[in-house]
Amino acid sequence: MRLFKEKLAWAAPLAVIAIIALFSVNLFAQGNPQVRNLPVALIVNDEGANVDAVSSAVQQMSKGIDGEEPMLAFTIERESDIEDLFHDKKYYAALVIPEGYNDAVQHALENNSPAALQVYINQGYNITGANAAKAALNGLIGQLSNKYSEEFKAQLGDQKIDTDQAAVLVNPIVSQEK
Protein backbone atom coordinates (compact mmCIF):
# COMPACT_ATOMS: atom_id res chain seq x y z
CA MET A 1 0.00 0.00 0.00
CA ARG A 2 2.81 2.32 0.75
CA LEU A 3 4.17 1.81 -2.82
CA PHE A 4 0.98 3.24 -4.36
CA LYS A 5 1.13 6.33 -2.17
CA GLU A 6 4.67 7.31 -3.14
CA LYS A 7 4.72 9.68 -6.11
CA LEU A 8 8.35 9.00 -6.95
CA ALA A 9 7.66 5.29 -7.49
CA TRP A 10 5.16 6.19 -10.26
CA ALA A 11 7.36 8.85 -11.85
CA ALA A 12 10.11 6.49 -13.04
CA PRO A 13 7.87 4.10 -15.06
CA LEU A 14 5.93 7.05 -16.52
CA ALA A 15 9.18 8.75 -17.56
CA VAL A 16 10.37 5.54 -19.25
CA ILE A 17 7.06 5.20 -21.13
CA ALA A 18 7.22 8.86 -22.22
CA ILE A 19 10.79 8.49 -23.49
CA ILE A 20 9.94 5.31 -25.42
CA ALA A 21 6.90 7.01 -26.95
CA LEU A 22 8.97 10.01 -27.97
CA PHE A 23 11.60 7.87 -29.71
CA SER A 24 9.01 5.70 -31.46
CA VAL A 25 7.23 8.75 -32.86
CA ASN A 26 10.58 10.08 -34.08
CA LEU A 27 11.48 6.77 -35.75
CA PHE A 28 8.01 6.49 -37.28
CA ALA A 29 8.37 9.93 -38.86
CA GLN A 30 11.71 8.93 -40.41
CA GLY A 31 10.43 5.57 -41.62
CA ASN A 32 11.07 6.05 -45.33
CA PRO A 33 13.17 9.11 -46.13
CA GLN A 34 13.09 10.13 -49.79
CA VAL A 35 15.96 11.84 -51.53
CA ARG A 36 14.70 14.75 -53.62
CA ASN A 37 16.30 17.53 -55.68
CA LEU A 38 19.94 16.80 -54.89
CA PRO A 39 21.94 19.47 -56.74
CA VAL A 40 24.18 17.90 -59.38
CA ALA A 41 26.34 19.74 -61.92
CA LEU A 42 26.23 18.73 -65.59
CA ILE A 43 29.42 19.58 -67.44
CA VAL A 44 29.34 19.24 -71.24
CA ASN A 45 32.72 19.40 -72.98
CA ASP A 46 31.73 17.82 -76.31
CA GLU A 47 29.09 18.00 -79.03
CA GLY A 48 27.26 15.47 -81.16
CA ALA A 49 24.34 13.06 -81.28
CA ASN A 50 25.66 10.87 -78.47
CA VAL A 51 26.12 13.91 -76.24
CA ASP A 52 22.53 14.91 -77.02
CA ALA A 53 21.43 11.41 -75.96
CA VAL A 54 23.09 11.91 -72.56
CA SER A 55 21.51 15.36 -72.25
CA SER A 56 18.05 14.01 -73.05
CA ALA A 57 18.51 11.19 -70.51
CA VAL A 58 19.48 13.82 -67.93
CA GLN A 59 16.37 15.85 -68.81
CA GLN A 60 14.19 12.74 -68.40
CA MET A 61 15.77 12.09 -65.01
CA SER A 62 15.16 15.71 -64.01
CA LYS A 63 11.41 15.44 -64.59
CA GLY A 64 10.67 12.99 -61.81
CA ILE A 65 8.17 10.14 -61.84
CA ASP A 66 4.39 10.52 -61.58
CA GLY A 67 4.57 14.23 -60.85
CA GLU A 68 6.89 13.78 -57.87
CA GLU A 69 10.00 15.87 -57.45
CA PRO A 70 13.06 14.37 -59.15
CA MET A 71 15.87 12.75 -57.20
CA LEU A 72 18.52 14.92 -58.89
CA ALA A 73 18.37 18.56 -59.97
CA PHE A 74 20.89 19.20 -62.74
CA THR A 75 22.53 22.55 -63.49
CA ILE A 76 24.98 23.14 -66.34
CA GLU A 77 28.38 24.34 -65.11
CA ARG A 78 31.98 24.63 -66.36
CA GLU A 79 34.56 22.03 -65.38
CA SER A 80 37.05 24.70 -64.35
CA ASP A 81 34.62 25.90 -61.65
CA ILE A 82 33.76 22.51 -60.14
CA GLU A 83 36.42 22.51 -57.40
CA ASP A 84 35.21 25.86 -56.07
CA LEU A 85 31.57 24.80 -56.33
CA PHE A 86 32.31 21.60 -54.41
CA HIS A 87 34.24 23.59 -51.81
CA ASP A 88 31.28 25.97 -51.43
CA LYS A 89 28.99 22.92 -51.05
CA LYS A 90 26.79 23.83 -54.00
CA TYR A 91 26.71 20.30 -55.51
CA TYR A 92 26.76 16.72 -54.28
CA ALA A 93 28.19 15.43 -57.55
CA ALA A 94 28.94 16.30 -61.16
CA LEU A 95 28.40 14.38 -64.38
CA VAL A 96 31.07 15.28 -66.94
CA ILE A 97 30.76 14.54 -70.64
CA PRO A 98 34.44 14.71 -71.61
CA GLU A 99 35.84 16.03 -74.85
CA GLY A 100 35.92 13.23 -77.44
CA TYR A 101 33.00 11.33 -75.88
CA ASN A 102 30.90 11.44 -79.06
CA ASP A 103 33.72 9.92 -81.15
CA ALA A 104 34.51 7.37 -78.44
CA VAL A 105 30.92 6.08 -78.53
CA GLN A 106 30.79 6.01 -82.33
CA HIS A 107 34.06 4.08 -82.59
CA ALA A 108 33.82 1.97 -79.42
CA LEU A 109 33.65 -1.36 -81.25
CA GLU A 110 36.38 -0.41 -83.73
CA ASN A 111 38.74 0.80 -81.00
CA ASN A 112 37.84 -2.03 -78.59
CA SER A 113 37.50 0.46 -75.76
CA PRO A 114 34.35 1.76 -74.09
CA ALA A 115 33.47 5.44 -73.94
CA ALA A 116 33.71 7.01 -70.49
CA LEU A 117 31.53 9.47 -68.64
CA GLN A 118 33.16 11.04 -65.61
CA VAL A 119 31.42 11.28 -62.24
CA TYR A 120 32.83 13.66 -59.63
CA ILE A 121 31.63 13.04 -56.08
CA ASN A 122 31.69 15.68 -53.32
CA GLN A 123 32.15 13.49 -50.22
CA GLY A 124 32.82 16.58 -48.12
CA TYR A 125 29.30 17.94 -48.53
CA ASN A 126 27.19 15.13 -47.08
CA ILE A 127 28.25 11.52 -47.46
CA THR A 128 24.69 10.18 -47.59
CA GLY A 129 23.63 12.66 -50.25
CA ALA A 130 26.86 12.13 -52.20
CA ASN A 131 26.36 8.36 -52.18
CA ALA A 132 22.74 8.76 -53.31
CA ALA A 133 23.84 11.05 -56.16
CA LYS A 134 26.62 8.62 -57.09
CA ALA A 135 24.21 5.69 -57.21
CA ALA A 136 21.72 7.65 -59.33
CA LEU A 137 24.40 8.82 -61.78
CA ASN A 138 25.83 5.30 -62.09
CA GLY A 139 22.30 4.06 -62.75
CA LEU A 140 21.89 6.68 -65.49
CA ILE A 141 25.19 5.63 -67.06
CA GLY A 142 24.12 1.98 -66.84
CA GLN A 143 20.87 2.76 -68.67
CA LEU A 144 22.76 4.61 -71.41
CA SER A 145 25.21 1.72 -71.69
CA ASN A 146 22.36 -0.79 -72.08
CA LYS A 147 20.76 1.38 -74.77
CA TYR A 148 23.97 1.56 -76.79
CA SER A 149 24.64 -2.13 -76.21
CA GLU A 150 21.31 -2.99 -77.85
CA GLU A 151 22.06 -0.64 -80.76
CA PHE A 152 25.50 -2.18 -81.30
CA LYS A 153 24.04 -5.70 -81.20
CA ALA A 154 21.53 -4.72 -83.87
CA GLN A 155 24.30 -3.19 -86.02
CA LEU A 156 26.51 -6.26 -85.78
CA GLY A 157 23.79 -8.76 -86.59
CA ASP A 158 25.40 -12.18 -87.06
CA GLN A 159 28.99 -10.96 -87.40
CA LYS A 160 31.65 -12.74 -85.41
CA ILE A 161 33.48 -10.63 -82.85
CA ASP A 162 36.53 -11.16 -80.66
CA THR A 163 36.55 -11.07 -76.86
CA ASP A 164 37.63 -7.42 -76.67
CA GLN A 165 34.71 -6.38 -78.86
CA ALA A 166 32.39 -8.56 -76.79
CA ALA A 167 33.49 -6.75 -73.63
CA VAL A 168 32.75 -3.40 -75.27
CA LEU A 169 29.47 -4.73 -76.65
CA VAL A 170 28.31 -5.66 -73.16
CA ASN A 171 29.41 -2.37 -71.59
CA PRO A 172 29.96 0.35 -74.22
CA ILE A 173 29.85 3.22 -71.70
CA VAL A 174 31.65 3.14 -68.37
CA SER A 175 31.77 5.46 -65.39
CA GLN A 176 35.04 7.00 -64.24
CA GLU A 177 34.77 8.29 -60.69
CA LYS A 178 36.92 11.13 -59.45
Question: PLM ranges: what are they?
Answer:
Residues 2-178:
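Extracytoplasmic/periplasmic domains immediately adjacent to an N-terminal transmembrane anchor
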